[in-house]
Amino acid sequence: MGQTQRSSQQSKPRAAAAPKRETKATSPARPDLAKQPTLYVVGYAHLDTEWRWEYPQVISEYLTKTMRNNFALFEKYPHYIFNFTGANRYRLMKEYYPADFERLKFYVSTGRWFPAGSSMEEGDVNSPNAESIIRQILYGNNWFRKEFGMASDEYMLPDCFGFPASLPSILAHAGIKGFSTQKLSSAWQPAPHVGGPDSPEKTPVGIPFNVGIWEGTDGRTVIAALNPLSYGSNVQYDISKAAPPPPGPDPSLSEQQNQQRTRRQEDWPQRVQINGNLTGVFADYHYVGTGDVGGSPNESSVKLMEAITTK
């Protein structure tokens, strides 16, 4: 997908319509990750609540298209599930678009829309102290419990720059079990000397593992997904199989593709196999979506994933 700013499903604001009652997501049995290779594909839209635009635009445009684009996809693709973070954004949805918010609550109740991230906002975790991070989780999940009758148990920071060694400990003490980000690679910041193509994990430089256990300063741990690719990734081929070779007979194309594959395209079955061989857990984690102004994954990705999961 790349850093797509607008998906094919975005449109002018329209009135909320009553959802069809047959849209409940199918809940498959949980796989045995010690035996069954599994790739978790996380549909997501990143939204910078404040960045290079004024706050009213977030309310009038970005939040509405996040809701309505995904509502349209839910009605067309019964296995599609969407994740969106930030209790503060949900608070704004409820205040300014109560009819849309009621429809969103229906999709939450049927397992189609997941209030993710456990926090009020996807905030920085370098400058704030431990209490500030804990309060993000306390207030965020309390809001989710009050409105949706459920809470998240993972911390999702795809777009934050840097994470302290104490973070797993802070998250674990706050009841959080999982963490994910796309911001560790040298593409974004100076990277530590871990990972790399010659490492056992075969990860990009700066990423110690794809999915594994991150231990904090007091020995507490969280499950961490550290290489899910960009939140702006598309699904362009059957990702249950190896990535297709580039067209044409020129072998240099294959070499260039392999060099550029770290952020946009992966051999997911191979990644799952490597992780299983190293850790005993045959699983991996893949962001698919858009940013930085909300919205939804593009429809072609959702359509292809629907075909892959139902074949």
Feature names for model-found ranges:
Residues T4-K311:
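Catalytic-domain carbohydrate-binding cleft regions of carbohydrate-active enzymes
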